[in-house]
Amino acid sequence: MLQLLKAFQQQGYAVVYASPAEESDHAVDLSQLNIRAERIELNNASFDTFIAQLNPQVVMFDRFMMEEQFSWRVEQHCPQAVRVLDSEDLHFLRHARHAALKAGITANQMPADEYLYSELAKREIAAILRCDITLTISEFEMTLLQRRFQIPADILHYCPFMLERGQADFELPEFSQRQHFVSIGNFRHEPNWDAVRYLKETLWPLIRRQLPAAQLHVYGAYPPKKATQLHNDKQGFLLKGWADDALRVVADARVLLAPLRFGAGLKGKLIDAALCHTPALTTTIGAEGLYRDSDDARQRAGYAAAGVNLADAALVADDPAEYARLAVELYQQQPQWQRASQAAAQVIDCRFSYARHQARLSDKLAQVSAQLQQHRLQNFYGSMLRHHSLKSSQYMSQWIEAKNRLKDIGG
């Protein structure tokens, strides 16, 4: 999100960040970034006054739930504003994979129809169709939306993480200076919590049997009591909780473990590993969208000439025994580790260049803004959904608003 806000600022927009959420303990101070922060309320007409007075040129919804809540109000009061949905990842895909895992189906990138075509999918796809542009974070999800849900390509825009090399602004340790394994991720995110339990119950015992002196340092915000109870010094399974500097702890580790069995989108922990030149070990789902070749022909040729293969940055295994074997090899064998570290060092420039993706986003916004009426006419199903389903969201919101008003009067 911060990368997108910065990109909008560089395009000349004055950015206002409006949220109904309570401020987190770890929230960024947006005022330091010259971004105005506003508190808004769900199901409250005060937003109508706020958005009408603001009269923005572009409105971006942070995931489909915010689109459901506020897009009808934006359309009513600022009909010429370009409506952008930041999908982050496809929620329905993550939930479909989770449901498949619970049913005993593992490591399946494309869940069966019974899991994929869910009520959640209907809501999220409807939000995508109602918006002028939806930002998708991985090519896999772009392809899924177009092939399985027939979403028009011109309302989708591939916009992954936008990063710059050197964000780890300290000297990165070499192989001999690093030790132990690291796992990192917010415990409130279900795929992360599942990965921690999978490590504790299945993978770490296999790894530790071969590396009895190794430790696994597990970091993440908001660890619940059931997570801290997994801490065991004797087993080398150490729950560390919140990391004050995530890049430092990833850089100090020799290998990052990310055994994600479900989820969607791009995995921030693997991006952190790339920023720190830390080799990683993940799963098919974990590696999704991260390590493909560059779409820049000159870059591809340069990496090929240098013998760099981006796929070396993270080894992939879905079988527990194979995962443990690769973890031990990557930890012990310096030549293999060096090859992986060198590949990781190229991932950011090759796949997630801030300059390249910021320019493409700017071009897409300019193109849609210049032809907004025609763009919307061509998205017939989107206009049909705005006509029908937004009315139901509108009336439900207005009903809740009226109910709350009556309760306040009665109270």
Where are the model-predicted features located?
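C-terminal amphipathic helix plus adjacent low-complexity
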Residues: Q336-Q338, Q342-G411
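Acidic donor-binding loop of glycosyltransferase active sites
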Residues: P56-Q57, D132, A251-G265, C276-T278
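Conserved catalytic-core segment of nucleotide-activated headgroup transferases in glycan assembly
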Residues: V16-Y17, R147-I151, L156-A246, A251-D252
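N-terminal subdomain of nucleotide-sugar transferases
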Residues: M1-A27
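Acceptor-binding helix/loop patch of EC 2.4 sugar-transfer enzymes
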Residues: Q80, L85-Y117
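C-terminal "capping" alpha-helix adjacent to the active site of nucleotide-linked donor transferases
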Residues: A297-A306, L315-Q336
